[in-house]
Amino acid sequence: MKRVGLIGWRGMVGSVLMQRMLEERDFDLIEPVFFTTSSVGGQGAIGKETVPLKDAYSIEELKSLDAIITCQGGDYTSEVFPKLRDAGWQGYWIDAASSLRMADDAVIVLDPVNRRVIDQSLDAGVKNYIGGNCTVSLMLMALGRLRGRPGRLDERHDLSGRFRAGAQNMRELIRQMGTINAAVAAEPADPASAILEIDRKGPETQRSAEFPVDHFGVPLAGSLIPYIDKELPNGQSREEWKGQAETNKILGRIKNPIPVDGICVRVGAMRCHSQALTIKLNKDVPIADIEGLISQHNPWVKLVPNHREASMQELSPAAITGTLTVPVGRLRKLNMGSQYLGAFTVGDQLLWGAAEPVRRMLLILLER
């Protein structure tokens, strides 16, 4: 039975990972060892025997493990991973953070899409397996069946949910919502109140010096933020750059990349990403054939008919938050020509966007 270290299991991604491992009884298959960066010796977590928490910075403790799953973040990875490898550790490093994604000796894991790449890498002795960018993973879960077949992705318009920026940002969004509500709460309940007065108070509150923007820097509630991550010299944001870079690494196509680009915008959804996609097909393919390819790709993708009511009920963050379902809808040919396809997809960024791929990577290791 493999000794598996778990680090960062108290955070949001780590908590979802723990929940999924409990639901699927994964802990029955391993000897879990829980680590902490702040509470060494404290009460342990789940397992066959609860033991005190171990020091996540102790190279000697970490060296005793067959595999490590970390959701602790990029700073931890950057500090500990090279020291651990330099100390001669030959175990498997499974990481939800982005630090190692583009490393030559690492594989981005999304097994419903790139199981062949994962298996080939395991056979070749690769030991580093990294969860992908949440929007990229969710896009490929939705449309991965089209790769190498009739389509390529030319544009990706990402509406990014709030957890992507962190738990403190999620709390700030809720505070922003509450602040706006408090400023106008009396007026909506009064039928005699002037709607323009309500309309004036909302933006006035957003622009006030007291509006909580410590984490976002600008209002998000009742607004949007048209930029995510760092600014790059070519005009892209780093989040937009990841679309092509990580997609092609996941698919094993770095030398023959599929072009992927788009505009990434932050909106006030809590833990989901929504993506409007424009896909250029290699040839004119009937919509029915495309629907068949998408719906057969994996057990979690859900094809939503391109009708108003179905779209409103099934194709939104409110409908799928907390589920593994990845709905795809609004499929239709675009006015630019019969080789252009429009689509819209939504996914939970804490499940398929973060925790589930690393959980499933552990199971792949356990199969060997």
Curated annotation (Swiss-Prot):
Subunit details: Homodimer.
Keywords, in A-Z order: Amino-acid biosynthesis, Diaminopimelate biosynthesis, Lysine biosynthesis, Methionine biosynthesis, NADP, Oxidoreductase, Threonine biosynthesis
Gene3D superfamilies associated with the record: Dihydrodipicolinate Reductase, domain 2, NAD(P)-binding Rossmann-like Domain
Reactions catalysed according to its record: L-aspartate 4-semialdehyde + phosphate + NADP(+) = 4-phospho-L-aspartate + NADPH + H(+)
EC number from the UniProt entry: 1.2.1.11
Residue sites binding phosphate per the record: 101, 242
Database matches in HAMAP family: ASADH
SUPFAM superfamilies: Glyceraldehyde-3-phosphate dehydrogenase-like, C-terminal domain, NAD(P)-binding Rossmann-fold domains
Residues annotated to bind NADP(+): 10-13, 37-38, 72, 160-161, 191, 349
Protein name: Aspartate-semialdehyde dehydrogenase
Active-site annotation: 134, 273
PANTHER family reported in the protein's UniProt record: ASPARTATE-SEMIALDEHYDE DEHYDROGENASE (PTHR46278:SF4), DEHYDROGENASE, PUTATIVE-RELATED (PTHR46278)
Domain of life: Bacteria
